[in-house]
Regions:
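N-terminal domain-start signal
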Residues: 1-355
Length: 355
């Protein structure tokens, strides 16, 4: 009863927002469209994106600008949830916000390291970050090099890990992105132990643990298949956290003498038994499927909990990814059938409890 009282307001809000998510028939329509303008006009009729698209000049109807609209809709949803949240729910949303911050910093790192002639295109994010983050976009967009960028993060939690990398003499984009990822996931792994209810801690542990495990597996696989890296070098790439992988399994995977042996050992782990990796090891796509399953089960079992918030934001992000994918399919001239293969949610290969 206490949870029902605490979450009744925000759960009602989430239910109203969930009703605005695109339905399977919407994806059928998107897949049938021939131009980016067709998709924009279709989204213009939706409640989630219409109010942002109507503010656009039709001369700006192209892929880059519509992707900004999608992100603005996500930020708008976050803002609505924050307004309805109590103090503990706000604390969770503040922690959730860090994923948007990390994405922003990663984008800026890539612009700086690639010496891109394309200027920082972040003005559409500025109002949101000014309100919910210590990161100052108006400073970041003036960064000319990595020293400027790191210094502009001085009043944020990201300064320390990136400053340490700078002082170490590391000089590649990969070094900085790795430092950012290691900091983020290690910090989030600690945050899951915070002052949350037991069921919320369980959900956060399962969701984050699966992400870390699968990200590590993805990096191990790529390091072996594409870069032929040795075990000591692979260890330096990995997040030093295991959830469903034992220490011995983790060691065996890293030290597998070949890609074929890695696949064999992978299929003996929890994830291999659950998802039955075939010849093509598609760990990245499995990651999204696994997290969605965990959050869906958590929400189904405990609708009056943080799962209601986290699952909705996950579904919103997945929706944006699918719309972006539809735009990409148009760019490459894919047929309706081919596009639908990317957009339509695949049948879950694993049911039951996410444990």
């Amino acid at each position: 009863m206490r949870d029902v009282m605490r979450y009744s307001g925000i759960v009602t809000k989430v239910a109203a927002m969930r009703a605005k998510l695109l339905k399977p028939q919407d994806y059928d329509q998107l897949a049938s469209m021939d131009t980016v303008t067709d998709i924009i006009e279709y989204l213009k009729q939706t409640k989630s994106y219409g109010k942002f698209i109507t503010q656009m000049d039709e001369s700006l109807y192209h892929r880059g600008n519509i992707e900004k609209v999608l992100i603005q809709s996500l930020y708008d949803d976050y803002t609505r949830l924050y307004r309805f949240a109590d103090m503990q729910q706000k604390d969770f949303l503040k922690i959730f916000m860090k994923r948007y911050e990390v994405d922003l910093v990663r984008y800026c790192l890539r612009i700086v390291f690639n010496h891109s002639n394309v200027p920082f295109d972040l003005n559409y994010k500025k109002p949101f970050f000014d309100k919910y983050s210590k990161i100052r976009i108006d400073q970041l967009v003036t960064a000319k090099n990595i020293d400027h960028l790191v210094d502009y993060l001085k009043n944020t939690e990201y300064y320390a890990p990136l400053s340490r990398i700078r002082q170490s003499g590391a000089s590649t984009l990969a070094d900085y992105e790795l430092a950012l990822d290691l900091y983020y996931f290690s910090m989030m792994w600690k945050e899951r132990k915070g002052n949350w209810d037991k069921k919320d801690k369980e959900m956060l542990t399962k969701e984050l643990g699966a992400k870390i495990d699968l990200l590590n597996l993805q990096w191990i696989y790529r390091a072996k298949k594409y870069y032929h890296m040795l075990a000591p070098d692979i260890y330096t790439l990995l997040i030093p956290i295991q959830h469903k992988l034992s220490n011995q399994e983790f060691k065996d995977l890293v030290e597998a003498p070949s890609v074929e042996e890695f696949k064999r050992r992978l299929n003996e782990t929890y994830y291999g038994k659950k998802y039955e990796f075939g010849e093509q090891v598609q760990i990245e796509s499995i990651g999204s499927e696994c997290v969605e399953h965990i959050l869906t089960i958590a929400y189904r079992n405990h609708p009056y909990s943080l799962a209601s918030i986290q699952q909705y934001l996950f579904l919103k992000e997945e929706e944006i990814y699918k719309i972006t994918t539809a735009l990409e399919c148009i760019r490459y001239g894919l047929s309706q059938r081919e596009t639908l293969q990317y957009l339509v949610q695949k049948q879950r290969r694993q049911g039951g409890n996410a444990s």
